[in-house]
A protein has these predicted regions:
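Generic beta-sheet signal
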Residues: 92-93, 145, 167
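Conserved nucleotide-sugar donor-interacting segment of glycosyltransferase catalytic cores
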Residues: 37-110
Length: 187
């Protein structure tokens, strides 16, 4: 007999933030002014959904800057929640940086979400580099998931003292094995 496998997919939605057709940039390739708020909403929404569904993750893998608020919430807002108490956080960095800093009020918006953290001062200027630096503070492991990662960010990752997986070509024969070994090393 054939086993029926079903995957469930959940969407975090908000008409104010996600009703537009473009994801991060407008038609002129400018970043939306509310990208910081959208990232904050997304992070909170994902974690509240995980709690509501009573999932207990072993590893939370965040991909690039837009999900970068998740590690901060896990370590500062949800740290005492039994669902997240033992979770390990992996952050993958890509070449998707932005030239202009996000909204200058981002630091205060994160603080208003219940994040009490002296390291928030890193986001006095919420540039791509500073956001990555802040996110890496709360990661248990870092992956350079692109050969086009910002060189400054890649160097910060290498000097972080955290377990690091350097860029792996998806065509490499040992691609999946290297990722599996990396996950095993942080658990």
């Amino acid at each position: 007999s054939e086993m029926c496998i079903r995957d469930r997919i959940y969407f975090i939605d908000n008409d104010d933030y996600f009703a537009r057709k473009a994801i991060l940039r407008d038609a002129d390739e400018s970043y939306f002014e509310d990208n910081d708020e959208r990232a904050i909403f997304f992070a909170r929404g994902v974690l509240e959904t995980v709690k509501k569904l009573r999932w207990t993750p072993t590893v939370v893998h965040c991909h690039d800057w837009f999900s970068g608020i998740v590690p901060i919430y896990l370590k500062k807002v949800f740290a005492d929640d039994p669902i997240f108490k033992e979770v390990k956080i992996v952050v993958s960095l890509y070449g998707d940086g932005f030239d202009k800093p996000l909204n200058a009020g981002m630091k205060e918006k994160i603080a208003n979400e219940g994040v009490k953290d002296k390291k928030l001062s890193i986001l006095d200027t919420p540039s791509y580099e500073n956001l990555c630096r802040y996110v890496m503070e709360y990661a248990d492991g870092i992956i350079l998931a692109s050969d086009a990662v910002n060189p400054e960010v890649a160097e910060l990752a290498r000097n972080s003292g955290k377990p690091l997986l350097e860029y792996q070509s998806p065509d490499a024969e040992d691609f999946f094995d290297n990722y599996n070994r990396f996950y095993d090393s942080i658990q």
